[in-house]
Amino acid sequence: MDERRAYLAGGAEAVSADFESLAGTLEATGDFRVLRRFVPPSRYHEGDGSPTKTALVVDVETTGLDPVRDRIIEFCGVPFEYEPESGRILGVGPAESFLEDPGRPIPAEISRLTGITDAMVAGKTIDEAAVGRLVAGAGLVIAHNAGFDRPFVDRRLAAFKDKSWACSQKEVPWKALGVSSGALEFLLMKRCGLFFDGHRADADCHALIRLLQEPFDDGSLPFRHLLESARTPAWQVWALDAAFDKKDLLKQRRYRWSGGEGGRPKAWYRTMSVAEYESEKEWLKEAIYGGREGWRAERVDAKRRYVEEG
């Protein structure tokens, strides 16, 4: 039996080598790009003695887009160790993944997208104690669309209260550094030559960690850009009492509508960098308020960023 296993293993390695040879031949023509399946490693770099910290990548699958009405059906968190100065990721911990029964049928389009069915989640719940242990060791929580994930997570899991968050989709300058889209699957394909089965929380978490370690042409790491952004306070700008006919201008400028939940203003708002705010003030004055200053601006740090921005 051992000899047969060895024979089969050797055959598989030979087939794999043949496929790599074919892939290399195709790529050498310059007319083809070959995507390879992403297999998550447990380690990206060895430490060099520099200080390290722990971050946590999270992703949720939900019954819809509204954090008030919809529910989480899958949660995953993957911790990893990193060097805060260089942005190098060292070891990656095991994923903690949980399905949860939302107490209502999962919409058919969500099941088609995620593969998660009512039968899979029936009677299941997120282990809050396990999540609490996972979150306790992390100084930074990362999601690829934190404006979506954080409101769901904050409502469901008390362990995330007052944690610092960063958004790898918004806070890494993908377009400025030559990438036209911020979608996770596109980024992994375009930048790393890899594909994965997306729209399951654990796969998305591991794919994001891999993406954050792919250097840009200037040698900088996406994760270092993300860390620098997370450390820098931002402005949350509220276009209070903006005229109704200005809504399309504000939407084009990437403002979002707040319906007044949780004591927040009922107004259009946007979170932006300190540098962006300097030019935004002039635009608001001229385009929205007819030469006057009618907006409100608040400084926000990583603990307050993406709260209820779903």
Residue ranges: model-predicted function:
Residues 98, 175, 237-240:
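Residue-level marker of alpha-helix boundaries and capping positions
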Residues 3-163, 170, 177-198, 291-294:
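Conserved non-catalytic scaffold segment of RNase H-like nuclease domains
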Residues 203-211:
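Acidic, divalent-metal-coordinating active-site segment for phosphoryl/phosphodiester hydrolysis
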Residues 130, 207-208, 269:
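Short Asp/Glu-rich motifs
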Residues 2-46, 214-310:
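Acidic two-metal-ion nuclease catalytic site recognized across multiple nuclease folds
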Residues 124, 201, 263:
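Residue-level "edge-of-site" marker
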Residues 156, 174, 190, 211-218:
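Active-site catalytic microenvironments for nucleophilic, acid-base chemistry
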